[in-house]
Regions:
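Conserved AMP-binding/adenylate-forming core of the ANL superfamily
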Residues: 36, 82, 99-153, 170-175, ...
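Conserved pre-ATP/AMP-binding loop-to-beta segment of ANL
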Residues: 95-97, 219-221, 225-226, 230-268, ...
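AMP-binding/adenylate-forming catalytic core of the ANL superfamily
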Residues: 140, 165-191, 205, 344, ...
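Adenylate-forming
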Residues: 143, 185-204, 224-225, 328-331, ...
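Structural core segment of the AMP-binding/adenylate-forming
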Residues: 157-236, 354-355, 570-572
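Conserved C-terminal "lid"/linker of ANL adenylate-forming enzymes
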Residues: 217, 526, 553-556, 565-567, ...
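Conserved AMP-binding/adenylation subdomain of ANL enzymes
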Residues: 280-297, 305-350, 363-364
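Conserved AMP-binding/adenylate-forming
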Residues: 379-380, 387-515, 523-525
């Protein structure tokens, strides 16, 4: 029922051809012909794409093994750092700006690709000197800074996989990741500004390292400092001061670990790891198709720490040779036009943001947008959760019209000019797999949909019996493996392949023409403001650290898509749940409502994880508890 209600808000029969792409738009039938050709021999398709990269040793076998143990480009090896950065050395990209960083308080700096390469080598040399070897994990707990990307690229250069951890997580979640990755070095920042307030990142790291028993080194990037450092801590500038040795790039097997994340499952966040060869093939191809070009100035508002921020901030745009904007503040400080100021000031051509952000921004009024000249934008890409049709239209008309007429666009009437494309991505897959492709064969857009499938990904929607369905709600699945198949995964991922295809865990709907609407999770995993949140992780933390039994449910939230409800056994500690979740787990998992129920009910609710309250209110909770789970 709730999936149907989501579909009602998304569904549209409109077919929109943006004036900026009128010259290249094809029918959906023509697009699907190209798509079906790609999945008719999916292995040959990705083999052709793989030849776009430079391989030190070509693969002898395209693919081997049944899912989830499928591996691609067997016996092939490549220099990952070359394919991301060094390949630009002999062309004009080398002297252009690679990264522009702006802090919330207005400070800014920029570096070219050649300067970036120098910094990466310096950090790589320091890591080698500290004893980091290929295969050793490096952890980052920072906002998006130039230094953060330098560390990630230095990790790639020496063959050390990295995991960036979102700073919205608290010390308890950080500690778990430190333990699971067995890292000997952590990079963080002393603090940074968020909505005008100082976020003390270093203090969170200190609590996490103490709680986890971490014995390694903490490298502190000086953002606001200088901080007073402890014996196991060193300033980033001191860590790299003596590092001048030229570091040879690591040549990796295709299946060598590149980076990892902790993905949200029902009972906890679980570590997953992507391979070097398959991921780089997949992210480079999709980055080209979604619209990235070397002359683009690109602004992605999703931070590394989430898959979109890793794939389409750290890797994709730099492989293309684009200029990447990094911003570590909020969209509303000092006012709600901060993002539009950044786009205007730096002549941004491509914006990638989340549905949740646009939902909130659309409710602040049009003038925050219209007072800025956004003519340089040529596409707006959207991801993370369903995008309602009315929010799509607001984005298209208010952000996407601009001031300069183009073909049939009429600025004074806000008719829209550039494409607004909603796309689907998942941490386990690594890249976008649905959406209209700006740099590929482009069909009309249907507002509210996540577009048609992307070539190379065999997508289907199935009912509970595994039968394909059209114009009915089912589960989004992938029928065949993709190049960036995980090389480390939990048992839940194995279970997703149980029936011979990959179950994404998301409800979806497909029109007869082939457009897909992704509707949200069919399990207890929560999607709130674009974040994928594990309910079990919250329950475990509150049990371990407060001693209270809690079950976590989700409710429909018109701003966040879903919000968190905590129902606990009557206890004096129940009143501490909101503050405890902020401190232990991070502000992104703070419940919107805390209620109480008997212990028996708590356990019954945990066994019914697919419950979704249609509104976030005590009345809705009381109704659920009084009427029972039936």
């Amino acid at each position: 029922l709730w999936a149907s209600s989501v579909l009602e808000k998304l569904y549209s029969k409109d077919l929109v051809i943006p004036p900026a792409l009128k010259w290249k738009t094809v029918s959906i039938e023509e697009y699907l012909r190209v798509y079906r050709e790609s999945i008719s021999d999916i292995y040959s398709f990705w083999e052709r794409e793989a030849r776009e990269l430079v391989w030190i040793k070509p693969w002898s076998i395209i693919v081997t093994g049944d899912p989830p143990k499928t591996r691609w480009f067997i016996n092939g090896s490549l220099n990952a750092y070359y394919n991301i950065i060094s390949k630009h050395r002999d062309n004009w990209v080398w002297s252009k700006i690679a990264l522009i960083w702006e802090g919330e308080e207005g400070d800014a700096k920029a570096i070219t690709y050649s300067e970036l390469d120098v910094l990466v080598n310096r950090v790589a040399s320091a890591l080698r000197a500290y004893g980091v070897k290929p295969g050793d994990w490096i952890i980052l707990y920072t906002p998006p800074l130039i230094e953060s990307l330098v560390v990630m690229l230095a990790s790639v250069k020496i063959g050390a996989p990295f995991e960036p951890i979102f700073t919205g997580f608290g010390y308890w979640e950080l500690a778990k990741r430190i333990v699971k990755r067995s890292s000997k070095i952590i990079f963080t920042v002393d603090s940074y500004y968020r909505r005008g307030k100082i976020v003390n990142t270093l203090e969170t790291v200190r609590r996490a390292t103490e709680y986890s028993g971490f014995k390694g080194k903490v490298v502190v990037i000086e953002r606001i400092g200088p901080p007073s450092l402890k014996s196991n801590e060193i300033a980033f500038s001191d860590f790299t001061r003596e590092s001048s040795v030229l570091v040879e790039d690591y040549v990796a097997e295709s299946t060598h670990p590149l980076f990892g994340l902790h993905s949200g499952y029902i009972d906890d966040y679980k570590p997953i790891t992507h391979p070097t060869g398959g991921f780089l093939v997949q992210v480079y191809s999709t980055s080209k198709w979604i619209g990235l070009r070397p002359r683009d100035t690109y602004f992605c508002t999703v931070w590394p720490g989430w898959i979109t921020g890793v794939s389409y901030v750290v890797f994709g745009p730099l492989m293309i040779g684009s200029t990447v904007i990094l911003y570590d503040g909020g969209p509303d400080y000092p006012s709600w036009d901060r993002w539009w100021s950044i786009i205007e000031d730096y002549a941004v051509t491509l914006l990638l943001t989340t549905s949740g952000a646009l939902r909130v921004l659309s409710r602040q009024g049009d003038n925050y947008v219209l007072k800025h000249n956004l003519d340089t934008l040529r596409a707006i890409l959207v991801t993370a959760e369903p995008l309602e049709a009315d929010v799509w239209w607001w984005t298209y008309r208010i952000i996407g019209t601009g001031r300069t007429p183009l073909i049939t666009s009429i600025p004074r009437e806000l008719t829209g000019r550039i494409p607004v494309v909603n796309m689907y991505i998942q941490s386990e897959i690594g890249t976008f797999i649905t959406g209209n492709l700006v740099n590929y064969t482009f069909p009309p857009i249907i507002p509210g949909s996540t577009g048609p499938p992307i070539p190379g990904f065999h997508i289907d929607i199935v009912d509970s019996n595994g039968k394909s369905v059209v114009e009915n709600i089912g589960e989004l699945v992938l029928r065949e493996p993709w190049p960036s198949m995980l090389i480390e995964y939990p048992e839940e991922y194995v279970e997703k392949w149980r029936y011979g295809y990959y179950r994404t865990g998301d409800y979806a709907y497909s029109t007869r023409e082939g457009y897909i609407y992704v509707l949200g999770r069919l399990d207890g995993v929560i999607k709130s403001s674009g974040y994928r949140i594990s309910p079990g992780s919250i329950e475990k933390a509150l049990k371990d650290l407060l001693g209270v039994e809690v079950t976590v449910l989700k409710c429909r939230d018109p701003m966040r898509f879903e919000s968190i409800i905590a129902i606990c056994v009557e206890s004096p500690n129940c009143s501490e749940i909101k503050q405890a979740t902020r401190t232990l787990l991070g502000p992104i998992v703070e419940p919107i409502i805390v209620a109480t129920a008997p212990l028996k009910t708590i356990f019954e609710l945990r066994n019914n994880r697919n419950i979704v309250l249609e509104e976030c209110s005590l009345n809705a909770i009381n109704k659920l508890l009084s009427e029972g789970l039936n």
